[in-house]
Amino acid sequence: MRIAILSRNENLYSTQRLKEAGEARGHEVDIIDTLHCYMDITSSNPTVRYMGKVLPKYDAVIPRIGSSITFYGTAVVRQFEMMGTFCVNESVAISRSRDKLRSLQLLSRKGIGLPRTGFASKPDKIQDLIKNVGGAPLVIKLLEGTQGIGVVLAETNKAAESVIEAFMGLKANILVQEFIKEAGGADIRCFVVGDKVVAAMKRQAAEGEFRSNLHRGGVAQLVRLSKDERATALNAAKAMGLNLCGVDILQSNNGPVVMEVNSSPGLEGIEQATGKDVAGLIYEFIEKKAKPNANRTRGKG
């Protein structure tokens, strides 16, 4: 099969692993810089151009779209969908996952476990917003933040008020969530491919830190999922419409709760922690599912 990886940096671990794994299985794999793609959308024969040439017909596209280029990146994915190319994650699903509020609303509608959450831009009563999620300690997040950036733990109601007022001064949209103290600074990353959790790792925050992101110094280890945790991860991926994603779960007193669904999860941490060939499992999925016009939205959304 001929497969394209959309990635801005061919030297990233995940990009390199996907290329190596694909070629090891006999596929022809091209790495394409998403931002250097440009599209012909005026004709009845949609194409994607790159480096002055029309790109060839691909059997599948693996989007590795960074959050900073979501708008343009999803437009490129949508163009491939319009051409009938199978995209591992569809443009609509990627867009959903990048909108934290929309993601939580979709998960809530499906009855998937979530931390108590409030959303605000200019709340008239900050105290009521804080009270509504159970009071301090609580977590305040910028909607646009990634890798733990723009996430603050407020230990007291007064501190929470100050942080919310500061974010309001920046005209930022914020989420206010209950702090799951019983998780002990740890979360579980479930790597979903198709309808299976193919790998899972537990990430423990560094000492004195509540964010477990590996970019923040967290450490990862192999973990065995409970039946509820596995079901929660699969239901979250299904609700978002993602074939490939990382679902981050906290273990609360009320069962597993979803913190985030990542449509472009990194491979380095999960492969090193579990010893699994996750990149190869992604190609197994592609080999089974990649057919012309197999996308559900087919570029319509």
Curated annotation (Swiss-Prot):
Pfam families: RimK, Rimk_N. InterPro entries: ATP-grasp, ATP-grasp_RimK-type, ATP_grasp_subdomain_1, RimK, Rimk_N, Rp_bS6_RimK/Lys_biosynth_LsyX. Mg(2+) 1 binds at residues 248, 260. Mn(2+) 1 binds at residues 248, 260. PROSITE patterns: ATP_GRASP. Belongs to the RimK family. NCBIfam families: PRK10446.1, rimK_fam. This is Probable alpha-L-glutamate ligase. It comes from Shewanella loihica (strain ATCC BAA-1088 / PV-4).
